[in-house]
Design a protein with these regions (language model features):
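Hydrophobic core of transmembrane alpha-helices in multi-pass small-molecule transporters
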Residues: 31, 100, 111-127, 247
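Extracytoplasmic gate region of multi-pass secondary transporters
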Residues: 37-46, 229-281
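Intracellular juxtamembrane helix-capping segments at the cytosolic ends
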Residues: 48, 126-140, 148
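Central cavity-lining transmembrane alpha-helices of secondary-active solute carriers
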Residues: 61-79, 280-281
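C-terminal ends and interior cores of transmembrane alpha-helices
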Residues: 95-108
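Helix-loop-helix hairpin linking two adjacent transmembrane segments in secondary transporters
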Residues: 150-204
Length: 281
């Protein structure tokens, strides 16, 4: 059930394809995933290490475990998306991500820190990116790559804004209040468009992907499916080679981003302000 009705969507669609509004919502989702991304945590690592008296090794271990657990739970989230649709799952994810920010800001020991990492990695870096991509792909077929490319700009903007803004919030309000602000801003940015504008797929409002006209010829409506299904893909060696490649790249980039501010502080004697601005693409 959607708060926006088919009539309103079609009125907007006469001026521009409604799928581009979905791309904007998806881009906001990718941007908001910054609350659970390594480039944001990097700004907080030096102050958390100092205030909680927890070593960088212990924090990175907790972060690694939280990331791996979140990754292995993502297929379950994918099933929820298939069952309930991306919109309701996105709304739930955003609500829980906001509470994850509040939980992380209240961390006073290693256990709470690890739990906060788990919340933020699963609902931010994992689920939010998954659902945002899913809802965009529902609205596009021939222009899917272009639409996903536009949506991906949200991540670049997040890399450019979240670290320096986080550093500013830490300096002005302290790291705990910074997480409260991030949590509430995530709700403010994402909940209104998801509640009032998001639609799972074009068929829900009597439309087709890419804004295509309806085809009455039954022969032409049959789409040709090319590729492998899940069970077939899992039997191919190339699947595991590609999966390992993406896994390795993600782990390397995560490690570098997570420690970037700390490394630049300690080994290059750069201030946190400069270190966080270096994330700007």
């Amino acid at each position: 059930m959607f708060l926006i009705n088919s009539k309103t969507v079609n009125e907007i669609n006469t001026k521009m394809f409604y799928g581009w509004i979905i791309v904007l919502i998806g881009g906001l989702g990718i941007f908001s995933s910054g609350a659970g991304q390594s480039h944001t945590f990097s700004a907080f690592l030096p102050i958390i290490t100092k205030e909680l008296n927890i070593s960088s090794t212990s924090i990175s271990t907790a972060y690694m475990i939280a990331t791996l657990v979140a990754a292995f739970l993502l297929p379950r989230m994918g099933k929820f998306v298939d069952k309930f649709g991306p919109r309701i799952v996105l709304i739930t994810t955003i609500i829980l991500l906001g509470f994850g920010c509040l939980l992380f800001g209240a961390a006073s020991n290693f256990f709470m820190l690890a739990l906060g990492f788990g919340f933020l990695r699963f609902f931010g870096q994992g689920s939010l990116m998954l659902c945002s991509s899913n809802i965009v792909t529902q609205w596009f077929d021939k222009k899917r790559g272009f639409a996903l490319g536009l949506m991906g700009l949200g991540f670049a903007i997040s890399m450019g804004l979240h670290p320096p803004i986080s550093n500013y919030l830490i300096e002005v309000y302290g790291w705990r209040m910074a997480w409260v602000i991030i949590g509430f801003s995530t709700w403010i940015i994402m909940l209104p468009p998801l509640i009032f504008l998001a639609v799972n797929k074009p068929e829900d409002v009597n439309m087709l992907p890419d804004g295509a006209e309806k085809i009455t010829n039954e022969k032409n409506t049959k789409s040709k499916i090319i590729g492998l299904n899940l069970s077939e893909a899992l039997k191919e060696k190339c699947f595991y080679i590609l999966a390992f490649s993406f896994f390795s790249i993600s782990m390397l980039v995560t490690a570098l981003h997570f420690f970037q501010v700390t490394i630049l502080n300690e080994y290059f004697n750069l201030s946190s302000q400069i270190a966080t601005t270096l994330f700007i693409p």
